[in-house]
Amino acid sequence: MQPGRILIYGDSNVWGDKGFGENGVPLRRYATEQQWPNILQQLLGDEYNIIQAGLCGRTAGEYVGHAPYLGGKIGYEIALREASPVSGVIIALGVNDAQNESASGEQIVADLQWYSAYTQAYAADSENGMASSGSVWYIAPAIAPVQCYAPLASKLHYINEKLRATHTTISNPLDDHDDYAPDGIHFSLQGHRRVAQAIYKAIKEGVAR
């Protein structure tokens, strides 16, 4: 029996960015085996193949003044085709959108929901060989509980609430300062491990199939 294939499509935390140190210096990238998609692969073993597609700065939508390649939709059309056929897709986007002052919570939710609609349409085309596959699961966007990001709290809460009402959404387990790098956005090593464990649990319990 062939293992299932899961595409993980997201931003810098999917890519494995260490973020910035307390002095603002970029800390580069975690080793491959320390990045949560690859930790998840280790936990799942031969049952699934994980396809990691992360990009620093990626957004769910497109914004004026941003580099076109950072808009997630065009990249997703390519990534889904490259990974197909897939058993499912995990979308880990939204925080970069929330930091954009021009982006309303409503628009971000609509942009995130696009990924599910596009995947369903892609899976429905018999030429793509996905049969009844095409489930999309979202990781609820979250950031560290630090004061400098307090203005984003209401927007992120709105996004999470709306996604949960319409789509399978896996709770982000990172609720502690130690789960994040000093910049409060990127995951620490502990954070990468905790996210991988949460996604693994969701898959094994049937929340994500």
What is each PLM-predicted segment?
Residues 20-30, 64-68, 146-154:
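Short, flexible/disordered intra-domain loops and linkers
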Residues 56-66:
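N-terminal beta-loop-helix "entrance" segment that forms/cooperates
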Residues 52-58, 171-175:
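Acidic carboxylate-rich catalytic motifs and surrounding loops in phosphoryl-/glycosyl-chemistry enzymes
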Residues 11, 17, 55-58, 93-95, ...:
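Gly/Ser/Thr-rich helix-start
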Residues 1-54:
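Serine-esterase "nucleophile elbow" of acetyl-processing enzymes
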Residues 16-17, 60, 99, 146:
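Glycine/Thr-rich phosphate-binding loops of Rossmann-like dinucleotide-binding domains
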Residues 2, 34, 38, 46, ...:
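Alpha-helical cap/lid subdomain in secreted, periplasmic
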